[in-house]
Amino acid sequence: MEGATGLRVLLCLLPLLTLQARPALGLATGRPRGSEKRHAVDTSVNGVSIKSLKVNCKVTSRFAHYVITSQVVNNADKAREVAFDVEIPKTAFISDFAITSDGKAFIGDIKDKVTAWKQYRKAAVLGESAGLVRASGRNMEQFTIHITVGAQSKATFRLTYEEVLKRRLMQYDITIKVRPKQLVQHFEIDVDIFEPQGISKLDAQASFLSEELAAQTIKKSFSGKKGHVLFRPTVSQQQSCPTCSTSLLNGEFKVTYDVNRDKLCDLLVANNYFTHFFAPKNLTNMSKNLVFVIDISGSMEGQKVRQTKEALLKILEDMRPVDNFDLVLFGSKVQSWKGSLVPASNANLQAAQDFVRRFSLAGATNLNGGLLRGIEILNKAQGSHPELSSPASILIMLTDGEPTEGETDRSQILKNVRNAIRGRFPLYNLGFGHDLDFSFLEVMSTENNGWAQRIYEDHDATQQLQGFYNQVANPLLTDVELQYPQDAVLALTQHRHKQYYDGSEIVVAGRIANHKLNTFKADVRARGEKQEFRATCLVDEEEMKKLLRERGHVLENHVERLWAYLTIQELLAKRMKTEGEERANLSSQVLKMSLDYHFVTPLTSLTIRGLTDEDGLEPTIDKPLEDSQPLEMVGPRRTFVLSAIQPSPTAHPIDSKLPLRVTGVDTDPHFIIYVPSKEDSLCFNINEEPGVILNLVQDPDTGFTVNGQLIGNKASSPGQHESTYFGRLGISSPTSDFQLEVTPQNITLNPSSSGSMFSWRDQAVLQKDGVVVTINKKRNLVVSVDDGATFEIVLHRTWKGSAVHQDFLGFYVLDSFRMSARTKGLLGQFFSPLDFEVFDLHPGSDPTKTDATMVVKNRQLTVTRGLQKDYSKDPRHGAEVPCWFVHDNGAGLIDGVHTDYVVSDIF
């Protein structure tokens, strides 16, 4: 970060799941905002200001969808370098990234990593990386892109990523690390939570705010299934002192919540996908058999062994009298404290603590011998002592290095451990520091029903060790199996778990075979403290109908993507343990699902068309490996220059399952309205005659207007509906004395005063009084109007020899920021927030489509689920957009009737 040339505006946000709160660095003290007089302050740094920075997190049934949007403005008289700098959790998958600058849109394409690597082989040969995402800490990955923003220009960044929230220690955590490094004109964190089980608690805190300022700026509420947190500080509330131009936003913003546990388990079904949440309450803690296997080789010298001893002493204090335990130490030789399990009596615990305080380091690393000794102790207890066979057995191993003594072949060690445990109990591996093969520890743990965790060499390593132990300290059930009717379920995620711990949650997802919902149920079998556990879960169909009415397409989309996320994660875990043909088959499955669901995973990359660095390379977004080098250890960074958007030779339409975020009109003419609050789209057609001019956008406050004239086919068959398209668009801004006329043949600036004319064969950037027009040869043009809006016009070419069809235009809204709330028009009226509810889903007159009842604008309409094409990103092929189709020229959805939007002139 340091030593970078040029200006860097850092937009740093870190949403991640945390086990423990982490101390924020360089925090400014929050100050009361009472009687202190605030002065107007310049929010820019070297002429560059962050106009807006917004984090939107929408959680539906544990599935979290994040969108980070930031707009920077360069008011300087020369170009500046700007950095968009965001940290995201390692468990998340990026699903979209886009930049809009100077009226140009730069869109990400997800493709297989092999194809992406071939395009960037030059960087690989040079030993450099064009990658934007790198490992940067314990639970995070850092996404950074540097771009050059022209003088008097702006750039908007939008990053989207998704993950499934994991319950730890009785709650779900969302932590957002805030570090903009300068004052932000419009700063906002908006967290919206919908949990069908009902929310039992919700809290939000900011480490960088005083209690008084937090009370003023953090709004939090929850009722029933819904929870909401909003943090929107003013510029004065961001200032570190009344006259300062520096920001106190430097630290963590943390949201925690949990859900009601009134049922033993909850089944959620939507669109033939299901999610099963299992976290029963009021269960008795099981006694446990616990063996710690500790590395005491010479490399543990110093702080590592001191912190390990501190953690072990605290863990021993917390053990219950019903537990049994032993300690195994391995260096060059292997030694155990007792050689067998002993009860956790006060006398035994004190003796064990004395043993921990006294042991010293010795020799190399006989990891294989240490593990086999620990396994032997647990196996012997289960086989020869009936009273010790019922508790939950747990093996925990801590090491900081690689095997150097005894058996050192990793594949043989894996085989030895697997054959010794034989699925009887879980093995948890803790890797201390970076000087070890962490993937080896991961494979070993996952092969034996556990997981691996890295312990970072830091002042809080003791707390990290204790934090891990707290997650497994209280087993409630063992040998948990969630069972479903065999013929009713497809593509099931992991449904057998060796142990279930207090404060956690088991989540299973899958697909339901067609027409099998009536027979769908879940049976749970497990072993509890001295008794068997049995439960049956049924789908509450009435409750599901109610949930679908409340959440509609968002619920359907999130349940399916939750299944996809879990499936990909599990396939990747299996892939890590396999080789040869089996590994290739798993890779193929992961790749297909990653492309289908638009996820950046270890097998895919996201490239950004139109951005190039000094070597002509486009940036690429990859998923870094867990063992990849930290950010400060990698090579030189690369700065990308925004160039005209060009078709990607490997671009492919985004899968039709994805809800694409577009508002626009194209083809016959089909209007698509994206509704962010629902993560869904509405659509309607307008049927009018060729020659009719329709008003698309009109802002009465500024006079900004967009009109479009319809054209028909060259020829039509008698008695058939005549298709119409937009063949002419007129954009005008009276405040800028600006007019633009666009046809499939020409682009004319200020036609009424004989202005300049361009063709679609040109590549040009035009600028007039705050309006920028970018012509991208034979593809599209983008109009950016000051801070008001950004629009795209797409060119559609038909076959030159066609006797029926002719060329036409599509019109899309990329940004309606700052347009007035009074904006009207067939598209403009939807720039303001819109809400709707959909219910009573049923087969329509077309058996392949679903009809439903929609309530919108206090009107009740019949709508049909369908698909429309969005050509904004791929003018040739387009991408299918699921939407609710409103019949009869949008009647009931649009204000008035469609003929109210007929105007007499293109301007």
From Swiss-Prot:
Tissue: Liver specific.
Keywords on record: Glycoprotein, Phosphoprotein, Protease inhibitor, Proteoglycan, Secreted, Serine protease inhibitor, Signal
Post-translational events: Heavy chains are linked to bikunin via chondroitin 4-sulfate esterified to the alpha-carboxyl of the C-terminal aspartate after propeptide cleavage.
A GO molecular-function descriptor: serine-type endopeptidase inhibitor activity
Task of the protein: May act as a carrier of hyaluronan in serum or as a binding protein between hyaluronan and other matrix protein, including those on cell surfaces in tissues to regulate the localization, synthesis and degradation of hyaluronan which are essential to cells undergoing biological processes.
Protein name in the entry: Inter-alpha-trypsin inhibitor heavy chain H1
Record carries keyword Signal: yes
UniProt entry tagged with the keyword Signal: yes
Propeptide stretches in the record: 27-31, 669-907
Gene name linked to the record: Itih1
Cited InterPro entries: ITI_HC_C, ITIH, VIT, VWF_A, vWFA_dom_sf
Oligomeric and partner information: I-alpha-I plasma protease inhibitors are assembled from one or two heavy chains (HC) and one light chain, bikunin. Inter-alpha-inhibitor (I-alpha-I) is composed of ITIH1/HC1, ITIH2/HC2 and bikunin. Interacts with TNFAIP6 (via Link and CUB domains).
Modified residues (Phosphothreonine): 399, 404
Cleaved signal peptide residues: 1-26
GO cellular component, one term: extracellular region
